[in-house]
Amino acid sequence: MSRRNLSLSSRNENTRNKKAVRNAVRFDHGEIIAHFHEGLSSVKGQMALARTLNEKGNKEASDSICRSQIVMAESLLDFYLHEISKCCLCEMYDGVRAQSKEYSNLRVSLFRVEEAIYSKASRGWLLDQITEDYSSACFLSERSMRRQLTVIGISYKDMLERAFPDKSDDQRAKIVSKLFARRNAIAHQGDRNHVDATLNQVDETYAIYYIDCVERIVASIHSLVVQGLTA
């Protein structure tokens, strides 16, 4: 019986394919809001499907779509906040937007500092740094959204007043807290009550109202962002 050759073969060095480094893309205001509206159009299209299913007597499927689009609408809000934050912070660096207090406290890695020094003609290092920092962040709570708007120089109070002009301050605050609470219930609890595990009620009317509130919030933020340009 012949012996098996168990010796390790030599490995050629530097033969692995190197992954291409993808730098963050900087979008302007128009592109960012266009991304949001594109996603929102899809959400509204799904709501039309929910209506059709409900009219045909398939309420369970209709309700399921309503719940999924509530979560989707907030994901669009979250992504919008990420993209508009990167845009505004880069504009502060460029000198076309007033710098917020929080801008001065941004954390920058030594690697990015070296990149900035050796590539003076490029400002991509800052966008890459911000993208890296925000990649795991979520702004879907009243506290985190308020804090993030402060970072980019937007007043949370002004945003709510512009989004819901016919409501009182207390009513505006409740709208936002309820929006985030319902999204969390759907995304993390299957939309069931913590007390007795009963399924929360949902219908097309509520989902459309919810989606409209998200659209109002984004429109308000965006108008304040554009208004804040200094050059």
Where do the PLM segments sit?
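Amphipathic, Lys/Arg-enriched alpha-helical patches that create a basic surface
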Residues: G39, Q148-A185, N200-A231
